[in-house]
Amino acid sequence: MRSYEKSKAAFKEAQKLMPGGVNSPVRAFKSVDMDPIFMQRGKGSKIFDIDGNEYIDYVLSWGPLILGHTNDRVVESLKKVAENGTSFGASTEVENELAKLVIDRVPSVEIVRMVSSGTEATMSALRLARGYTGRNKILKFEGCYHGHGDSLLIKAGSGVATLGLPDSPGVPEGIAMNTITVPYNDLESVALAFREYGEDIAGVIVEPVAGNMGVVPPQEGFLQGLRDMTEQYGALLIFDEVMTGFRVDYNCAQGYFGVTPDLTCLGKVIGGGLPVGAYGGKADIMERIAPSGPIYQAGTLSGNPLAMTAGLETLQQLTPESYQEFVKKGDMLEEGISKAAAAHGIPHTFNRAGSMIGFFFTNEPVINYEAAKSSDLKLFAKYYKGMADAGVFLPPSQFEGLFLSTAHTMEDIENTIQAAEKVFQAISR
């Protein structure tokens, strides 16, 4: 059995210093009935805690580290940039370079604006949609998390799902009234909402692959149906690709599924592990943003050279072949864990999209938030503890997906399968 004594002591101190002892709720490990594990360093596919325990890491800082921890090229480039200055409050050439790369790879993006977080990206995209259309309402989907902006904390997923909060105190009723929420993968509900409110719907925001109720891909025709309805009613289609961007495919989820939105929100991978966000889209829409247009948005550290450099170095190392390797690794992981779970009578369902993996403790297909909630959370908590003790670091929430990196090896996958086999054997007794 591993020792977590230093982590326990650090958490005890942290609880006196920060709300709940953490700076983001899911890190509190509440849904797995554990104290948080405090990390110290990472290299490649491995992460090490302050007690000296080593783990194969499938959290990867919640997605950004698609090359693994402390990638040599990323680290060296950051050292060089930091020596010249971490931020200037002025434009730099590296902003142009990352913007050109994003525009080249993301089908919907003709112009892009950099910000400092995914939440900033989605909040700004909603303001732009409202300003561009002159309408008020936003349609979103149950269990889809788009950051902690007031308009979007209505039946959100992710940590909100883990805590069992359908929304958050502090969100004014007037704001909530302008957010319409319908089930994911349910076009009929979308059609009903448009028939009722269509003239005042500014935009539809959706994760093209839901990543905050576990991993839930779109059913065939769902994204195209959204594209058709938004065009019919004059609303904007907004893809929140903060998580899926450059994780599902070389050209993001929109490239993989062949559906082009009006606006796209990005984050995580495009910062290479540093705080970042971006939103972009059609030029005529994006030109409404200040200083080109009247819709205001700004940020002190937007486009800072550290985040831009880390993002640029990360994206430059990704190739179409990288995503073929993700499929091979994912196939091996799914086949091995499914076989082990079945052998011990463990209910399970896998959902996958590129380098994103959802593993649910239910035999039912998981196509929306209601189905995701059917997963056995007590069984997940037992599995989580067992895997941590076996040296596998997973997201401490059933409603978060696993992430693969280019640094993960087939040996890592095999060791993960062997660990799962032993844990399933133990928890099935």
From Swiss-Prot:
Which pathway does UniProt place it in? Porphyrin-containing compound metabolism; protoporphyrin-IX biosynthesis; 5-aminolevulinate from L-glutamyl-tRNA(Glu): step 2/2
- Where would you say this protein principally sits, based on its record? cytoplasm
Note the subunit structure: Homodimer.
Question: What molecular functions are annotated in GO for this chain?
Answer: glutamate-1-semialdehyde 2,1-aminomutase activity; pyridoxal phosphate binding; transaminase activity
Catalysed reactions listed for this entry:
(S)-4-amino-5-oxopentanoate = 5-aminolevulinate
The compartments listed are:
Cytoplasm
Q: Which cofactor does it need?
A: pyridoxal 5'-phosphate
* PROSITE patterns recorded: AA_TRANSFER_CLASS_3
| The protein's Enzyme Commission number | 5.4.3.8
SUPFAM superfamilies membership = PLP-dependent transferases (SSF53383)
Q: Name one GO biological process term.
A: protoporphyrinogen IX biosynthetic process
List modified residues, type N6-(pyridoxal phosphate)lysine.
Answer: K268
What cellular component GO annotations does this protein have? cytoplasm
Its domain of life reads Bacteria
Q: Which UniProt keywords apply?
A: Cytoplasm, Isomerase, Porphyrin biosynthesis, Pyridoxal phosphate
Listed name of the protein: Glutamate-1-semialdehyde 2,1-aminomutase 2
Cited Pfam families: Aminotran_3
Q: Which family does it belong to?
A: Belongs to the class-III pyridoxal-phosphate-dependent aminotransferase family. HemL subfamily.
Classification via Gene3D superfamilies: Aspartate Aminotransferase, domain 1, Type I PLP-dependent aspartate aminotransferase-like (Major domain)
